[in-house]
Design a protein with these regions (language model features):
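Phosphate- and other anionic-substrate recognition elements at nucleic-acid/protein interfaces
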Residues: 1-18, 22-150
Length: 150
């Protein structure tokens, strides 16, 4: 069942996080024992089957205990144009891979990812390839930080 933005009981193991977008999906990986997220991959394209094939490869490689999906919301917390699509994506992940997918508020992660890349000296034209990965990293780090605070 797709979880809400509030973290559930602690889960041990590897976690994959997704920054869902219409054209790209950023992916990050982290280990719950240490609570640290790392950018992993960007899945480009708009067709579902190649996207899910790439996700299946990552799941086969990393054997996650849990999946996290960023939930896009407006600054005031209301639904965004992609909110329903992100929820559907989380349900599709659960149905295809038999893993729990929890939703985490992703407000401002893309802006924060862009700022982090600029601060690291990455040229703006290079952001597109890694920005979504870094946004997924920030989503997963938010999950870890919320879990630790509870």
């Amino acid at each position: 069942m797709v979880g809400t933005a509030a973290p559930r009981a602690s889960r041990a193991g590897t976690i994959l996080a997704f920054d869902f977008g219409a054209r790209r999906i950023g992916v990050a990986v982290g280990e719950s024992a240490i609570g640290l997220a790392h950018p992993l991959a960007t899945i480009a394209g708009e067709q579902n089957e190649p996207r899910f094939a790439a996700i299946e490869s990552l799941i086969d490689e990393w054997h996650p205990a849990l999946l996290i999906v960023g939930l896009p919301l407006h600054a005031d917390g209301t639904a965004h144009a992609l909110t329903a699509r992100a929820r559907r994506f989380a349900k599709q992940l659960e149905g295809r891979f038999g893993l729990t997918a929890e939703l985490v508020d992703e407000r401002f992660t893309t802006h924060a990812a862009t700022a982090a890349l600029s601060d690291a000296g990455v040229k703006a034209r290079s952001h597109k390839g890694v920005r979504d990965q870094v946004a997924a990293q920030l989503i997963l780090q938010t999950y870890f930080d919320q879990r630790e605070a509870d």
